[in-house]
Design a protein with these regions (language model features):
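Intrinsically disordered, low-complexity repeat and linker tracts
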Residues: 1-51
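Non-catalytic cap/lid and distal C-terminal segments of serine-dependent acyl enzymes
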Residues: 31-206
């Protein structure tokens, strides 16, 4: 009888390497949105990847200087605002860019101070402008910022030293400030300067 030959299974000479998984591209980080789906960044604008140091000459006066003006308006005492029983006369310091014209419309930036401060802290006064105003002037003049209006108000209530009282300032005045901002300050600003608001009603300001 013939001897059966053993069956030999062919084996590859080289063990194949595992297929490398392609590196996945990270998904773009979604910008946080507010309740209306707004990100606060225009579609054609890019957020810089790093902060830029302010050039030293920006702290000196620019050739093209914006102006500071006082805006006086009426509001009500913060703690009893809803009763509207005690009127207050307040002011905000407003920055108007170089070449401001009523024939053009401007965006408005509301810039609030912190503790132990007031409406003059950021930009100074018309008589004594602060150094930070120079920075804004240069940035606008160099095209790094579009011409815009800055409004510096204060949440100080009945005393210029209110912001130095931590309990009063951060426990009451800043919490209540939205009443004054929405009902009194913004309408005063939008009704005085050339902005994108159609009128000073809540619908017009939106």
């Amino acid at each position: 009888a013939e001897t059966e030959k053993p069956v030999v299974t062919d084996r590859p000479d080289v063990t194949p390497l595992p297929t490398e998984k392609p590196t996945e591209e990270p998904s773009p980080t979604k910008k946080p949105e507010d309740d209306n789906g707004n990100t606060g960044v225009a579609e054609n604008e890019k957020i810089p990847k790093k902060l830029q140091e302010i050039p030293a000459d920006y702290y000196t006066e620019a050739d093209r200087q914006g102006s500071l003006v006082e805006l006086n308006y009426e509001t009500y005492e913060s703690r009893t605002y809803e009763q509207k029983s005690r009127k207050l006369n307040k002011r905000a310091i407003v920055y108007l860019p170089y070449g401001y014209s009523e024939n053009e419309r401007y965006n408005v930036f509301y810039l609030m101070h912190g503790g132990w401060s007031n409406e003059t802290t950021w930009l100074g006064t018309p008589e004594r402008p602060g150094t930070f105003k120079n920075v804004i002037d240069h940035a606008v003049s160099d095209g790094k910022m579009k011409p815009f209006i800055i409004v510096c108000p204060t949440y100080n209530n009945e005393s210029p030293s209110d912001s130095g009282d931590y309990t009063l300032a951060y426990g009451t005045l800043t919490v209540n400030y939205h009443n004054e901002l929405m009902n009194d300050l913004i309408p005063a600003v939008e009704g005085t300067y050339s902005t994108y608001a159609d009128n000073v009603t809540p619908e017009g300001i939106k």
